Curated annotation (Swiss-Prot):
Its cofactor is Zn(2+). The gene is metG. This is Methionine--tRNA ligase. It comes from Paraburkholderia xenovorans (strain LB400). The keyword RNA-binding applies. Residues 604-710 form the tRNA-binding domain. Zn(2+) binds at C157, C160, C170, C173. It catalyses: tRNA(Met) + L-methionine + ATP = L-methionyl-tRNA(Met) + AMP + diphosphate. A motif ('HIGH' region) lies at residues 26-36.
Length: 710
């Protein structure tokens, strides 16, 4: 079982904890974009919070380097895979450094440590009787003489007919399907028509009762209810045997680690990638003289946390803990999943190119800490998606960071330097306003540790409002006009600067570079949480004030959009059928009678992808009288967000847990409240005034999320 869960009580936890933290490993096949940065910023804030408590915390990461895409991209660029991943590593490290991501070690999964650890995990699982060899049939490129992953096969979508769609899903209509269903399939690598070929593969027996029983017990320790519910759904009820065995091998040619005793067979990237967490830490342990085994062996008292996107929850809450448990390692203390990022309501997609790169943020002159603050202001402990609204981004940064926070120092520092030699009034350090700020710091720290960053920052900005109200009431600019007000002016400026120090302490996990500049300005040691009760002193004068932060200029936003314009174009919607163009609507039927739609063919009907969906969450939409926001499980790795105009008929709690039917391939629609990714079906009378009522369709209880309605 996992180590004890984190103590999230207010204030610093008792005792010095040993904590290993990771973020998911970025793939060495492309640039870091701001969707990636949500996770790294979230993790970094948490790590900095724990370090400020004085705990022994190590934050490690690595590039995920293995797999067919890396091999093929290197070939396309005329490089060896090693040359490609070395170059991409430098680019990734540059971007992480620019955004203040404070890795203790940033490594590569293509390392000797990772090869040895991956082999050891595999051999331990084999010794435990959890590895099977089986023959499977796969798509094969007869020209390149290689087996093809689903994403390396393209063809015409079997649902809407769109050309050049991937072997597992259509990016025009949103349908999912098997590669064998593609029309006129071809290999992305050579253009040849794939053939079917049999090969021996190696499987991790996740369906073994030992794995199932372990995972049923382990799932109870997860911090996020959404993750627990999803895992229980994947596990099913006792006796259902819903877990499938996991193919952990790939055939040559492949860039990765060869499986011991299996020439020409390689570990699938999802086996050695998470082991890469340990490999990076082992590399750090060797450099720092740490006892690696004491941290990762079964029964270790150290804590281990993984921050991930909700799309890889399956790997991190099923395969990874089971791999660790049955290879003699400790299991994760917890796994924290976050939602996806949209930009002005549009989903980010690397495969579609709809993303803003981290480097473009730097090159267009935006302060990386602006983005750190904005993301933190939207992040909480759930798996909710978050939206980067660029107008809101500009307004929030300018209002909160410049107008409220930095403004406090700029209003007081000049007077303190000119009139009082930069020294605070010691008696002012006991002011009631400062007492209220100090009392709030432990709760702010606790909110950070609980990953409720939005709550921590909301509380911090409320305190900044109180400080600004104090300054507005005291009017130091008026006090300075009369020498008789010298004591009062000194108090006002001293209270303001100490309040600024406390606000800087509260913001330090989010704005580390700004906090460092503040520490230099105030001539103090690096701030930690315990410093809430260590005020400024007249014995230590502050330094001259220098401008700490500028406002976001609209021209910078324009430059950012221009730099990413090609990747921000909307994905085209499926074209209307030719025979539907130019037709007028049929005349309405007489009042009280149903309108009979035109006859359609079975081919027309087949274009609609109807799926069983489970409503896993439902809430009212603030500002709308008609809409409910539904979170739907459609049997995919991630949930879908749908807005439905059924608020008049249902309370949100009535719908949670119900099965329904949705149109899964409806083009996503940007709405005022967010992105709607489908449509839930409901019935109503033709004349709703005469016969009111909305009725969400419910399938028979035997239906499962993701099943197609045919």
């Amino acid at each position: 079982m996992s180590a004890p869960a984190t103590d999230l009580s207010a204030g610093a936890p008792s005792g010095r904890r040993q904590i290993l933290v990771t973020s998911a490993l970025p793939y060495a096949n492309g640039q870091i974009h701001i969707g990636h940065l949500v996770e790294y910023i979230q993790t970094d804030i948490w790590v900095r919070t724990l370090r400020m408590h004085g705990h022994e915390v190590y934050y490690v990461g690595a590039d995920d380097t293995h797999g067919t895409p890396v091999m093929l991209r290197a070939e396309k660029e005329g490089l060896t895979p090693k040359q490609l991943i070395d170059r991409v590593w430098q680019e990734h490290k540059r971007d992480f450094d620019s955004f203040g991501i404070s890795f203790d070690n940033y490594y590569s999964t293509d390392s000797e440590e990772n090869r040895v650890l991956s082999e050891n995990v595999y051999l331990a699982l084999k010794e435990a009787g959890l590895i099977d060899a089986r023959d499977i049939e796969q798509a094969y490129d007869p020209v390149k003489e290689m087996f093809l992953p689903d994403r390396f096969i393209k063809g015409e979508c079997p649902k809407c007919g769109a050309k050049d769609q991937y072997g597992d899903s259509c990016e025009v209509c949103g349908s999912t399907y098997l590669p064998t269903e593609l029309i006129n399939p071809y290999s992305v690598v050579s253009g040849a028509t794939p053939v079917r070929k049999t090969s021996t593969h190696y499987f991790f027996r996740l369906s073994d009762p030992r794995c199932e029983n372990f995972l049923r017990a382990w799932v109870g320790g997860l911090a996020q209810p959404e993750a627990t519910n999803k895992m229980r759904e994947w596990l099913g009820d006792a006796g259902e045997a819903k877990l499938a065995d996991w193919d952990i091998s790939r055939d040559a040619p492949y860039f990765g680690f060869e499986i011991p005793g299996a020439p020409g067979k390689y570990f699938y990237v999802w086996l050695d990638a998470p082991v890469g967490y340990y490999a990076s830490f082992k590399n750090l342990a060797e450099k720092r003289g740490l006892d690696f085994d004491a941290w990762v062996r079964k029964g270790s008292k150290a804590e281990q946390y993984h921050f991930i996107g909700k799309d890889i929850l399956y790997f991190h809450t099923l395969f990874w803990p089971a791999m660790l448990e049955f290879s003699g390692h400790r299991t994760p203390t917890n796994v924290f999943a976050h939602g996806f990022l949209t930009v002005d309501g549009a989903k980010m997609s690397k495969s579609r190119g709809t993303f803003i790169t981290a480097q473009s943020v730097i090159e267009t002159g935006l302060n990386p800490e602006w983005l750190r603050y904005y993301f933190a202001a939207k992040l909480n402990s759930t798996m909710e998606d978050l939206d980067l609204n660029l107008d809101d981004f500009q307004a929030r940064v300018n209002s909160d960071l410049v107008g409220k926070y930095v403004n406090i120092a700029s209003r007081a520092a000049g007077f303190l330097i000119k009139r009082f030699d930069g020294r605070v009034q010691d008696s002012a350090m006991q002011h009631p306003l400062l007492a209220s700020l100090r009392a709030a710091v432990p709760q702010i720290a606790a909110n950070y540790e609980a990953r409720e960053y939005n709550r921590a920052l909301r509380q911090t900005m409320e305190l900044a409002d109180a400080v600004n109200a104090y300054v507005d009431t005291a009017k130091p600019w008026d006090q300075a006009k009369d020498p008789a007000n010298g004591v009062a002016l000194h108090e006002t400026c001293s209270v303001s600067i100490e309040a600024f120090r406390l606000l800087s302490l509260a913001l330090k996990p989010v704005l580390p570079k700004l906090a460092e500049a503040v520490e230099g300005f105030l001539a103090i040691q690096p701030l930690v949480w315990a410093d809430a009760n260590v005020p400024l002193s007249s014995t230590r004068p502050i330094n001259a004030y220098k401008h700490l932060m500028t406002r976001v200029d609209p021209k910078q936003i324009e430059a950012l959009l221009a730099a990413n314009r090609d990747s921000l174009q909307a994905t085209p919607e499926a074209a209307a059928p030719a025979d539907a163009k130019g037709k007028s609507k049929a005349a309405k039927a007489a009042a009280g009678k149903d309108e009979t739609p035109g006859i359609i063919s079975i081919d027309d009907f087949a274009k609609i992808d109807l799926r069983i969906a489970k409503i896993v969450d439902c809430k009212a939409v603030e500002g709308s009288d008609k809409l409910l926001q539904l979170t739907l499980d459609v049997g995919e790795e991630k949930t879908r967000n749908v807005f439905s105009g059924i608020k008049s008929a249902y309370q949100p709690e009535q719908l949670v847990g119900k099965l329904t039917v949705m149109v899964a391939n409806l083009a996503p629609r940007k709405m005022k409240f967010g992105l709607s990714e489908g449509m839930v079906l409901a019935a109503s009378a033709t004349d709703e005034k005469a016969e009111p009522g909305l009725y969400v369709l419910e399938p028979d209880s035997g239906a499962k999320p993701g099943m197609r309605v045919k």
